[in-house]
């Protein structure tokens, strides 16, 4: 069986498993799912800041996705408005070297009245999958392996293929 630890910091790989902030864990395979933060050490140039708000707004129309390409405002990426229903959706922005909170607030101010359901600020990886995601008894998955698709927040296919290769 698997052991899943949350609110626990990985510290190092040992001969019999790993050491965490809560002590040693014996394991045959260590799955690294630490997210984009583990890529920071490898290559900062592949990381963009992003902000996304889930909101209610009369100007969000069901079935009307907006993608805003403006390399001056959102260098290296874009802004988006994705409805989840009539009057409800996700509005976001990502870019290199910008204040994403200010950029998103500017979009929302232009669009009109809204009420916020939740706010998410997160780094996103844009350079694709890492070259080596299986090393010894460590398997790196998901965002930590660059297996997510930043344009859709997806990554089922790339993560699934990673699992197939790891199994081999």
Write out the residue ranges for each language-model feature.
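Predominantly flavin-linked oxidoreductase catalytic cores and closely associated redox partners
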Residues: 2-118, 125, 129-134, 146-148
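Glycine-rich phosphate/pyrophosphate-binding beta-alpha loops
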Residues: 145-157
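A generic short alpha-helical patch detector that favors 3-5-residue windows
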Residues: 133-136, 158
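Residue-level marker for buried hydrophobic side chains located in beta-strands
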Residues: 138-140
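An active-site-proximal "capping" alpha-helix that borders the catalytic cofactor pocket
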Residues: 155-168
């Amino acid at each position: 069986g698997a052991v899943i630890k949350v609110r626990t910091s990985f510290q190092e790989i040992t001969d019999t498993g790993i050491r965490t902030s809560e002590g040693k864990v014996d394991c045959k395979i260590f799955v690294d799912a630490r997210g984009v933060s583990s890529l920071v050490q490898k290559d900062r140039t592949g990381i963009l800041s992003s902000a996304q708000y889930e909101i209610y707004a009369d100007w969000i129309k069901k079935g009307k996705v907006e993608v805003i390409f403006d390399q001056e405002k959102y260098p290296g990426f874009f802004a988006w408005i994705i409805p989840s229903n009539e009057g409800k959706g996700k509005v976001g922005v990502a870019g290199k070297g910008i204040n994403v909170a200010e950029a998103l607030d500017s979009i929302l101010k232009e669009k009109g009245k809204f009420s916020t359901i939740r706010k998410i600020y997160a780094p996103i990886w844009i350079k694709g999958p890492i070259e080596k995601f299986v090393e010894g008894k460590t398997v790196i998955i998901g965002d930590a392996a660059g297996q997510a698709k930043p344009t859709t927040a997806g990554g089922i296919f790339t993560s699934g293929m990673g699992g197939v290769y790891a199994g081999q």
